[in-house]
From Swiss-Prot:
Residues that coordinate or bind NAD(+): D71, G72, N145, D146, R156, R173, D175, T186, G187, Y188, S189, L190, S191, Q245
Subcellular location(s) of the protein: Cytoplasm
Protein name as annotated: NAD kinase
Higher taxonomy: Bacteria, Pseudomonadati, Pseudomonadota, Alphaproteobacteria, Magnetococcales
UniProt cofactor(s): a divalent metal cation
Catalytic activity: NAD(+) + ATP = ADP + NADP(+) + H(+)
Keywords: ATP-binding, Cytoplasm, Kinase, NAD, NADP, Nucleotide-binding, Transferase
InterPro entries named in the record: ATP-NAD_kinase_N (IPR017438), ATP-NAD_kinase_PpnK-typ_C (IPR017437), NAD/diacylglycerol_kinase_sf (IPR016064), NADK (IPR002504)
Residues annotated as catalytic: D71
GO cellular component terms given for this protein: cytoplasm
Source species of the chain: Magnetococcus marinus (strain ATCC BAA-1437 / JCM 17883 / MC-1)
EC number: 2.7.1.23
Pfam families on file: NAD_kinase (PF01513), NAD_kinase_C (PF20143)
Length: 303
């Protein structure tokens, strides 16, 4: 792995500082580094140390993309690097994430292992969401975590009809509807009472948000199923949110169609780390009360 792209959470001073230090370290390892113009400016990175590319092209020609930030930064970067099929490594800046599972303190040792070939690559399922209107298709969007239909500013219920592979499954009144990947099962869907799905399983979750009828429970369907739903009531201020980062207004008559994408995200993991360790730490299973985390960065001399 000789060409490394960096994606930085620009609102996080720790991530900016880490980007600067990592760029210098990678140069000492004789790796070619690429950063965004915004990150180069924020971290004061010399053009001699890194090439500059727009975020949407950061994966082009790279052997690895490293995301410095949180899960939200990782999800945004995932869509940008998807077309390049480049593996991604997530580094968290203080809080363990389900996607950014490597801590800053572990980063350098972890990268040495990666450069030595000691790593696993896991393909994460993605979804493709479509909105179909009488005027034609108005949206096609790749999603790593979830697609959520919900009300906008007012806390009111929605009514929708859900079908799978053209077969009607249920009609529900609820605060909204979540369609999630296994990766997204630990996101909004988990907060809405959905199950945790191992990321290697080929399945899609359909999860009503606070349904009016308690018998409307989350269901998991095969990954090759096509899920579609329509809103059955004429009400304003309805949105379709994609990975919690893009919102699209919904109109009367819209049909939302969701299916497994023909693309997947390649995520790098240490073979010494397992998914259940991350669940236990992130969800505080059997954690000792009062445990504190050291969020400080190590001095460069300690690496």
């Amino acid at each position: 792995m000789n060409s490394i792209g960096l994606v930085t959470k620009l609102s996080d001073p720790m991530a900016i500082r880490a980007t600067s230090e990592l760029t210098e370290w990678l140069n000492k390892q004789h790796r070619r580094v690429t950063v965004t113009a915004e990150a180069a400016k924020a971290a004061n990175i010399s053009p001699k140390l890194a090439a500059i590319k727009p975020l949407e092209d950061i994966g082009e020609g790279q052997d690895l993309v490293i995301v410095l930030g949180g899960d939200g930064t990782f999800i945004g970067a995932a869509r940008d690097v998807l077309r390049w099929k480049v593996p991604v490594l997530g580094v968290n800046m203080g809080r363990l994430g389900f996607l950014t599972e490597v801590s800053y303190d572990e980063m350098y040792d972890n990268l040495k292992e990666v450069f030595a070939g000691h790593y696993n690559v896991e393909d994460r399922m993605m979804l493709t969401a479509f909105i179909r209107r009488e005027s034609g298709e108005v949206l096609s969007h790749h999603v790593l975590n979830d697609v959520v239909a919900h009300k906008g500013h007012l806390a009111r219920m929605m009514e929708f009809q859900v079908s799978i592979n053209g077969q009607h499954v249920f009609t529900s009144r609820a605060d909204g509807l979540i369609v999630a990947t296994p990766t997204g099962s630990t996101g909004y869907s988990l907060s809405a009472g959905g199950p945790i799905i191992h990321p290697r399983l080929d399945t899609i979750i359909i999860n009503p948000i606070c349904p009016h009828t308690l018998s409307n429970r989350p269901i998991a369907v095969p990954g090759d199923g096509q899920i579609s739903f329509r809103l059955t009531q004429n009400e304003p201020d309805r949105l379709l949110t994609l990975d919690g980062q893009t919102g699209v207004p919904l109109l009367d008559g819209d049909e939302i169609v969701i299916r497994k994408s023909d693309r997947s995200l390649r995520v790098i993991h240490s073979p010494d780390r397992n998914y259940y360790d991350i669940l236990r730490k992130k969800l505080h299973w059997a954690e000792t009360v009062g445990t504190k985390r050291d969020l400080s960065l190590r001095p460069a001399d300690d690496r």
